[in-house]
Amino acid sequence: MRCPFCAAEETKVVDSRLAADGYQIRRRRECTSCKERFTTFESAELVVPYVIKNNGNRVPSDANKLRVSLSRALEKRPVSADDLEKAISKIIIQLQSTGEREVPSKLVGSLAMDALKQLDKVAYIRFASVYLSFDDIEEFTKEIEKLRE
């Protein structure tokens, strides 16, 4: 791998360890020419399926859109950014593991709701109220009762 500092072609791996719950390898490298050190991450390249929207449109999976949606539900809740990123990674891995080239948006929403249910019940209700299009307080109450079971 080329050195990002001096563009020399020779670098050596100084340290390797697992990262991202074992789905990546983090490597510390050292340039043999300039002796600068830098970090690289290695992961399997898996195809993330397209999402089929309710209107039939097909769009690429978008981790940032998922991050924004989950972050909005988790706003001012005691959930770390690291836990959020782990949840997003888990959802993406679940989508990849379907082996499908296209998945319905309902699957993405369902996986997001499952993740939020594990992270924070209040965030789950916030997300569900939008995702399930709650019209009145009764629908909130029913969903809260499901959580209590």
Swiss-Prot record:
Disulfide bridge partners, by residue number: none
Presence of keyword tRNA-binding: no
The organism's place on the tree of life at top rank: Bacteria
Domain ATP-cone residue range list: 49-139
Co-factor binding comment: Binds 1 zinc ion.
GO biological process: negative regulation of DNA-templated transcription
Zn finger limits (unnamed): 3-34
UniProt-listed InterPro entries: ATP-cone_dom (IPR005144), NrdR-like_N (IPR055173), RNR_NrdR-like (IPR003796)
DNA-binding found in the keyword field: yes
Cofactor annotation: Zn(2+)
Gene Ontology molecular functions: ATP binding; DNA binding; zinc ion binding
Keyword annotations of the record: ATP-binding, DNA-binding, Metal-binding, Nucleotide-binding, Repressor, Transcription, Transcription regulation, Zinc, Zinc-finger
A Pfam family annotated for this UniProt entry: ATP-cone
Protein family per UniProt: Belongs to the NrdR family.
NCBIfam families: transcriptional regulator NrdR (TIGR00244)
Entry-linked HAMAP family: NrdR
Protein task: Negatively regulates transcription of bacterial ribonucleotide reductase nrd genes and operons by binding to NrdR-boxes.
This protein's name: Transcriptional repressor NrdR
Gene: nrdR
